């Protein structure tokens, strides 16, 4: 590879590259894009196409439209299309071919259920990402084919105040998540209240919780009935040196009148007014003298004993207020969606009430308007009932609205409407589509597409070996029979339980006079603790610690098992169940996962860690990115992080330094890919009583006894090997995507999974460290 001449007057020694250190720590998006720009400017001219190791995707999820962005860019390059918003493809003109393998009927759940069986896929592709559940035509979505208008009066629905748009669409109301939760009949106010268990699940402030010790109760402890008064609440926050703090509160009574609208001056120094969201500026807040304690005192006076607070993501508002209230209706959970997703308030306001809020031409959100809107949404739900809401088919409305969102320019609209097929046609090329006879897709009947329909997956495989080398762009679709709803539900449950048990350790025995506070500090030093309980069923006390991340549990085992603690030689181990019997093997394979090979986990990091690390980054060669998760509620940085390095060797050297006598951190190699961590964080944790066995459904037991190729475990291994052989036959420089689209049916939806790489792509040095912070989860900006 020949070096590129430097544009500046300075020269570098042969074989050396100038390391650029950012003058300040920047946010994830800015760091990612500056990283891309610098890399493209400073890297030598490459003879091979390659993907950036940094992926940036909100919630670690890549939409079907974003996939289409990449595929169109891969065909025509930046002269015709903007770069993809979520990844970077360098030297696109050196790309040889594009091949997309689709495993229809499989999902992210299947991949991690049979993780050990998909050996080649997890090792060969270091770029992995989540996908939302598929629409009725997944292929049309990722290719960018324009769908025919199939949903009755959808445009009118989005304009009207009472949208009956979906009445012409055949939908199964029985399987609608709103019907499953509330039933068909109208419900009273008390049925819409979040239970204490739900409030715990969704991180509402509750009395007795350690993170709510300084929170103030509203003192509303009266008896709530269906006639209790509703109050809409919305708060705006800014970012201070201690995290997010309250800057405005709006409280609206049931009649629509605003009973409280106050600006609030935070106690700590403001570092970001978040004006685009809050509408608050330094000039607005300067004369304000009202403090948080004043607002708390007024709320306690204003709210009657049986007051019900209504809001959208109300947990965030209550945490900003540092108050505890027992009776809440959260409209983001009231209008329930599948897979734990939530509709935005702006969408619900338009779809349900026919009103526009949070308009882009207005500076920030209007807290009073938002509070009043949540109140109206709650009253609409109570007036019309769950059946009416389900009939609106909000998912279809949401999909339609997304597809109709305009781009900034006419050119943008034109690009949006261009499909991959049209891109290929413009350069005189055709797309190959291999599938089975039974598969129906708009793609198969499209012009400029060479469709070959086969009788079986085996025939698709045979045709792929012959046809792929003849086409610049190929889509190969294998179809698998979806699992039964019962089996899918059981698999989902077992995944949750297994991950909880893998992240849980039992430690002991301890002396009865041991220092419990010191023990808690010790085990918390390995990482964030979800739950810690004292086990007294044994002769001597033990501790049960459930960690938030798998790395923390593994680090505790490796550090303390067989060690003398508080005068006792303790054993630290996971619970032994049928789901953890292969835990050691799974942990080892996770560590070898291509996405984890160059990543390390560190615990005990302080808020100044990132600045300290950047000051000494010259000793951490190959450092590509930092992931610094923040607590969703407080906005404070958590006490752990992940560092991504170019090579395993660089990661190992850094780990030795950071866990040494100078830095004194605890750490190990990472185990959890970013997208997996985000997915698991979104699942409600499940646990079971010790000794309770999980019995596989009879259908799976029978299949296992038969040991034939149709068993899911064997099928996963079998087809993983087949795809491996196809991959090895691809020419170097081929962009290859493996897509497990997920499933969407009346029985429920499953998220998809994507794996991506360029065959024989050349590794490259990243000149700038990317700092990634997240208040919600570990962001999927690294792959």
From Swiss-Prot:
GO biological process: rRNA 3'-end processing
GO CC annotation, single: nucleus
Domain Exonuclease: 230-378
Superkingdom of this protein's organism: Eukaryota
EC number(s) stated in the UniProt entry for this protein: 3.1.-.-
GO MF, any single term: RNA binding
SUPFAM superfamilies membership: Ribonuclease H-like (SSF53098), RNA-binding domain, RBD (SSF54928)
InterPro entries: Exonuclease_RNaseT/DNA_pol3 (IPR013520), Nucleotide-bd_a/b_plait_sf (IPR012677), RBD_domain_sf (IPR035979), REX1-like_exo (IPR034922), REXO1/3/4-like (IPR047021), RNaseH-like_sf (IPR012337), RNaseH_sf (IPR036397), RRM_dom (IPR000504)
Domain RRM: 503-577, 598-677
Keyword annotations: Exonuclease, Hydrolase, Nuclease, Repeat, RNA-binding
PANTHER family per record: RNA EXONUCLEASE 5, RNA EXONUCLEASE REXO1 / RECO3 FAMILY MEMBER-RELATED
Protein name: RNA exonuclease 5
Organism (species): Bos taurus
Upper classification of the organism: Eukaryota, Metazoa, Chordata, Craniata, Vertebrata
């Amino acid at each position: 590879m020949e070096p590129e001449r430097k544009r500046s007057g300075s020269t570098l020694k042969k074989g050396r590259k100038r390391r650029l250190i950012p003058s300040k720590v920047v946010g994830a998006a800015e760091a990612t894009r500056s990283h891309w720009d610098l890399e493209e400017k400073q890297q030598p001219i490459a003879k091979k196409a390659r993907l950036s190791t940094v992926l940036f995707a909100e919630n670690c999820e890549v939409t079907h439209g974003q996939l289409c962005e990449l595929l169109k860019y891969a065909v025509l390059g930046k002269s015709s299309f903007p770069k993809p918003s979520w990844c970077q493809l360098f030297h696109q003109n050196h790309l040889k071919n594009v091949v997309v393998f689709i495993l229809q009927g499989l999902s992210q759940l299947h991949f991690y259920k049979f993780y050990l069986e998909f050996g080649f896929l997890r090792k060969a592709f270091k770029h992995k990402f989540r996908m939302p559940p598929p629409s009725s035509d997944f292929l049309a979505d990722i290719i960018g084919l324009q769908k025919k208008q199939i949903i009755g009066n959808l445009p009118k629905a989005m304009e009207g105040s009472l949208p009956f748009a979906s009445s012409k669409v055949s939908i199964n109301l029985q399987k609608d998540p709103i019907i499953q939760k509330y039933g068909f009949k109208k419900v009273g106010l008390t049925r819409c209240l979040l239970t204490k268990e739900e409030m715990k699940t969704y991180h509402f402030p509750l009395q007795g919780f350690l993170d709510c010790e300084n929170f103030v109760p509203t003192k509303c402890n009266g008896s709530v009935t269906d006639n209790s008064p509703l109050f809409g609440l919305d708060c705006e926050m800014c970012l201070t040196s201690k995290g997010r703090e309250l800057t405005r509160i709006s409280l609206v009574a049931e009649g629509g009148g605003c009973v409280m609208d106050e600006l609030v001056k935070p106690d700590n120094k403001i570092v970001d007014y978040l004006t685009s969201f809050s509408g608050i500026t330094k000039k607005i807040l300067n004369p304000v003298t009202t403090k948080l304690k004043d607002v708390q005192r007024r709320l306690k006076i204003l709210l009657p004993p049986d007051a019900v607070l209504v809001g959208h993501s109300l947990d965030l508002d209550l945490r900003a207020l540092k108050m505890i209230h027992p009776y809440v209706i959260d409209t983001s959970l009231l209008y329930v969606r599948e897979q734990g997703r939530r509709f935005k308030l702006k969408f619900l306001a338009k779809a349900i009430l026919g009103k526009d809020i949070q308009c882009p031409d207005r500076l920030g959100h209007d807290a009073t308007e938002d509070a009043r809107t949540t109140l109206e949404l709650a009253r609409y739900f109570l007036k019309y009932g769950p059946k009416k809401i389900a009939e609106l088919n909000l998912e279809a409305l949401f999909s339609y609205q997304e597809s109709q969102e305009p781009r900034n320019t006419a050119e943008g609209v034109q690009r949006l409407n261009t499909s991959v097929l049209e891109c290929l046609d413009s350069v005189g090329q055709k797309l190959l589509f291999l599938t089975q006879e039974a598969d129906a897709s708009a793609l198969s009947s499209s012009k400029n597409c060479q469709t070959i329909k086969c009788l079986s997956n085996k025939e698709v495989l045979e045709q792929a070996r012959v046809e792929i080398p003849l086409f610049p762009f190929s889509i190969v679709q294998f179809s698998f029979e979806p699992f039964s709803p019962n089996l899918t539900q059981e698999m989902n449950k077992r995944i949750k339980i297994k991950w909880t048990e893998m992240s849980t350790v039992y430690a002991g025995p301890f002396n009865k006079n041991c220092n419990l506070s010191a023990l808690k500090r010790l085990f918390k030093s390995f990482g964030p603790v979800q739950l810690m309980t004292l086990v007294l069923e044994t002769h001597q006390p033990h501790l049960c610690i459930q960690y938030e991340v798998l790395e923390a549990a593994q680090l505790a085992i490796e550090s303390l098992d067989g060690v003398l603690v508080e005068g006792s030689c303790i054993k630290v181990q996971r619970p032994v169940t049928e789901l953890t019997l292969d835990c050691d093997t799974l942990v080892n394979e996770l560590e070898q996962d291509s996405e984890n090979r160059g990543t390390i986990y560190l615990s005990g990091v302080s808020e100044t860690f990132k600045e300290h690390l950047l000051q000494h980054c010259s000793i951490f060669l190959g450092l590509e990115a930092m992931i610094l998760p923040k607590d969703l509620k407080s906005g404070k940085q958590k006490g752990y992080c992940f560092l991504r390095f170019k090579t395993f060797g660089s990661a190992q050297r850094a780990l030795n330094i950071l866990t040494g006598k100078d830095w004194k951190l605890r750490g190990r190699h990472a185990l959890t890919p970013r997208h997996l961590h985000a997915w698991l964080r979104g699942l409600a944790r499940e646990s079971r009583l010790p000794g309770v066995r999980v019995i596989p459904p009879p259908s799976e037991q029978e299949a296992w006894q038969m040991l034939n190729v149709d068993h899911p475990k064997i099928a996963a291994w079998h087809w993983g090997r087949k795809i491996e052989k196809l991959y090895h036959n691809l020419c170097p420089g081929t962009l290859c995507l493996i897509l497990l689209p997920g499933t969407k049916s009346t029985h429920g939806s499953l998220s998809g999974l994507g794996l991506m790489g360029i065959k024989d792509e050349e590794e490259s040095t990243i000149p700038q460290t990317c700092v990634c912070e997240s208040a919600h989860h570990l962001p999927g900006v690294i792959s």
